[in-house]
Amino acid sequence: MYAATLAVVADWARALELPVALLQPRSADAHETPLNVRMVRMALGARAVIAVGGGLEGYLPALERALQGKTPIRTLLDHLRPTPDDLHIWLDLVYARQSCEQILRWAAQDGLLGLAQRQAWRRTELLFRQLAVRMREARTTLQGKAYLAVHDAYRPLTQQLGMRSLGSLQPDHERPPSLQAFRDALARARRARVAMVLCADESPLGATAARLLRVPLVLADTLEMPDPQRDYFTRMAGLIDALQRAV
């Protein structure tokens, strides 16, 4: 069994018919998960820990010390080409597909690549192709549209859609923006003829900005929080559709 640091990584492993457990607690997002005893125990019982790396999971150095070499930690970022400039690799279909391919290579090294996994990879390839079709269709309506986000984790996707990011209303998760910074962001958005405001959850800050700018507020899933009801491919399709519906 593998241990995945993030829900999206666990979804990829499950799509490939590989046994996997999720370290990330349901209530914590990808950046804010603190290391706890449950996570260490789960990792100790795994064949390997599969992580994004690059500092995304801030607890990885502490987990590595706790494991004392008993379970290897494998990071996807070390195998993605070209090297991503944004850690939200799951929102880029090219990097997401490369990640699945790397997980399969690790499975082969571990003796876990059988007929079921090869068949699962063919199904997974089809799911990626279907998402790519959705992307091309969405790009025809979204290309050139500007957006403002409460916290802009969307750029790996929005860049592929040809959208223009106007930055984050709240770059720091922990601190709300100053009133002047908020006004400056709104002024910048008006000059750019912003089309929408994006937020991952019900955000008073995002709602206020959307109301003042008179544009739609889009609840746009960053896929950072686990969702037991929907897998990676369903959530990505939903995110693309949510952006497209806003224009």
Q: Where are the language model's segments positioned?
A:
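Extracytoplasmic metal-acquisition and chelation regions
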Residues: 1-247
